[in-house]
């Protein structure tokens, strides 16, 4: 929870917040409607709406601010079991891909400020590609382990360091 809040505060400080948690978001209604409102088929409504709102504000050269307020208190319901958690996380992953695909024209465009130059590229590399890279790394590691190419003393020290500090 601490890393989540610190991450949100960092994104807020640079006005590059990628999303807000569903039940915790407050939006300027007129901007949300002008940007197209909620997209019903979206799997990540909050990220999609924020990205569209930022796109709208930048297209019309209007100032905007996306702020995380860390001391808000609101109750929300989490997944009650592992099956529901799995469905929630796969829906979020599909939503991330969907949002990145829909708004790909914003990526690396100076017009879209932090969202185009930092937030969307970050989301692509560290949220979308990272699990794929990690899976490939695991497969390669298993292959190397079976072929005897792993120095186990070094491998255990690396894993211990990674999982202790990351």
Model-derived regions, located:
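Alpha-helical transmembrane segments of polytopic integral membrane proteins
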Residues: 29, 50, 135-139
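A short, conserved alpha-helix in the catalytic core of glycosyltransferases
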Residues: 31-34, 42-67
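Catalytic core and acceptor-binding pocket of nucleotide-sugar-dependent glycosyltransferases
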Residues: 24, 45-48, 52-53, 121, ...
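Charged, alpha-helix-enriched surfaces in structured cytosolic catalytic cores
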Residues: 27, 44, 48, 80-84
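Basic/Trp-rich segment in TM-proximal cytosolic loops or flexible interdomain/linker regions
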Residues: 14-15, 79-166
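Active-site donor/metal-binding and catalytic loop motifs
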Residues: 64-84
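Long helical/loop segments within the catalytic core of UDP-sugar-dependent glycosyltransferases
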Residues: 1-42, 55, 90-97, 101
